[in-house]
Amino acid sequence: MSPQTETKASVGFKAGVKDYKLTYHTPDYETKDTDILAAFRVTPQPGVPAEEAGAAVAAESSTGTWTTVWTDGLTSLDRYKGRCYHIEPVAGEESQFIAYVAYPLDLFEEGSVTNMFTSIVGNVFGFKALRALRLEDLRIPTAYTKTFQGPPHGIQVERDKLNKYGRPLLGCTIKPKLGLSAKNYGRAVYECLRGGLDFTKDDENVNSQPFMRWRDRFLFCAEAIYKAQAETGEIKGHYLNATAGTCEEMMKRAVFARELGVPIVMHDYLTGGFTANTSLAHYCRDNGLLLHIHRAMHAVIDRQKNHGMHFRVLAKALRMSGGDHIHAGTVVGKLEGEREITLGFVDLLRDDYIEKDRSRGIYFTQDWVSLPGVLPVASGGIHVWHMPALTEIFGDDSVLQFGGGTLGHPWGNAPGAVANRVALEACVQARNEGRDLAREGNEIIRAAAKWSPELAAACEVWKEIKFEFPAMDTL
């Protein structure tokens, strides 16, 4: 280590302000297997050199502050400081660069996403020397990964619980999202489940409002689940949203769901918070409940290309905190999501080992070792004509969720569910026979519609519906 970057208590305390780069920019540093690595997109203020801006990010997200303090001499900053070890330009952006920062593992509490984010995406994002700052990716070392429980159950255990294999799972968000009474809500759930869906879902903003208190909703939905199971012979579920104003109330709702014997509950992990989410995930594993995660508020954090945090980081954090499903965009529907980037973080959710691949936005190789995987949920503006593309893009280990694409069917909820189930089964069969879903998708759907009047009606209603806007999230 060069004399410039080494911090020695023996030289005595010298008050004053010095450039961050003298201590925190260390281009010769060799990263350790135990370091947490971060890739930041940095937009400095005019006149701030890249080395100084990158070093400032490393400093302000680890041990540094704006001036020298005498207590620096009471510890070893070389052991604990973050280091900006590499800087690279951003193609097509003269004012931006990627700063790579390494953090010693001792800076973070074991098993706490909350603590990790408090440092890495804390006050540094308001630093005046930066015009904008975005966390593009994190490398979580194996040593830190092993301190997390992760998803309550994971993909294989969920399939075993549901006894459903070889195809994506089908879901539906009950609409209108607000305003239904508990009994009418339960009726809508029943109609969808008996028609062929595997799951129905509370909308993310359904908690416990005056028009429908949570306990009433839970009871009527449980009744709908059991009735649909008896009629179809299949295991069914409804994502009962346990999100609440306090952790205690959230846990009370999860306990009641377990007492009803339902298979799955739901949480809004960003608005609810990582501490609450991790607590709920631990409860779900201990009590046999699956946990569906909604990402409400994510676009506030991840949609701007130059500031905030990319969703792949939020996806990694969710896998650590715990969840069996998480919404991940659709590529083809009404919500944001470019194909290669979406598939990049979908792999980060599902797979054990993911190689670095900058073409898909993956900055670091990630080894999850034995942490269970998470099912990505495709939801938002999708309908039967999208089924071939969704099946081809997301594969079997996914949940395809049609809200308006089920309840908007001209004949009602159950026929809407039938249409989606028939379309899915047709696509899976065609794929298994070796047909090209991307090229022959429409033909496959039309052929299935000839013997399914429910699917034929759905095809007619949504034949002209498209959401063709350019994606914001591009490389």
Swiss-Prot record:
**Keyword Protein biosynthesis: yes or no?**
no
User: Residues that bind substrate, according to the entry?
Assistant: 123, 173, 177, 295, 327, 379
Quote the record's cofactor note.
Answer: Binds 1 Mg(2+) ion per subunit.
| Annotated positions binding Mg(2+) | 201, 203-204
Compartments in which it is found: Plastid, Chloroplast
Using the record's annotations, give every residue carrying the modification N6-carboxylysine.
201
Molecular function in Gene Ontology: magnesium ion binding; monooxygenase activity; ribulose-bisphosphate carboxylase activity
A cellular component term from Gene Ontology for this protein is: chloroplast
Write down the chemical reaction(s) this protein catalyses: 2 (2R)-3-phosphoglycerate + 2 H(+) = D-ribulose 1,5-bisphosphate + CO2 + H2O; D-ribulose 1,5-bisphosphate + O2 = 2-phosphoglycolate + (2R)-3-phosphoglycerate + 2 H(+)
Spell out the residue numbers of the propeptide.
1-2
UniProt cross-references to PROSITE patterns, sorted A to Z:
RUBISCO_LARGE (PS00157)
Superkingdom field: Eukaryota
According to its UniProt record, which residues of this chain constitute the active site? 175 (proton acceptor), 294 (proton acceptor)
EC identifiers of the protein: 4.1.1.39
| Transmembrane regions | none
How does the annotation summarize its subunit structure? Heterohexadecamer of 8 large chains and 8 small chains; disulfide-linked. The disulfide link is formed within the large subunit homodimers.
Q: Which PANTHER family match?
A: RIBULOSE BISPHOSPHATE CARBOXYLASE, RIBULOSE BISPHOSPHATE CARBOXYLASE LARGE CHAIN
| Functional summary from the UniProt entry | RuBisCO catalyzes two reactions: the carboxylation of D-ribulose 1,5-bisphosphate, the primary event in carbon dioxide fixation, as well as the oxidative fragmentation of the pentose substrate in the photorespiration process. Both reactions occur simultaneously and in competition at the same active site.
Something else the entry says is: The basic functional RuBisCO is composed of a large chain homodimer in a 'head-to-tail' conformation. In form I RuBisCO this homodimer is arranged in a barrel-like tetramer with the small subunits forming a tetrameric 'cap' on each end of the 'barrel'.
Q: What is this protein called?
A: Ribulose bisphosphate carboxylase large chain
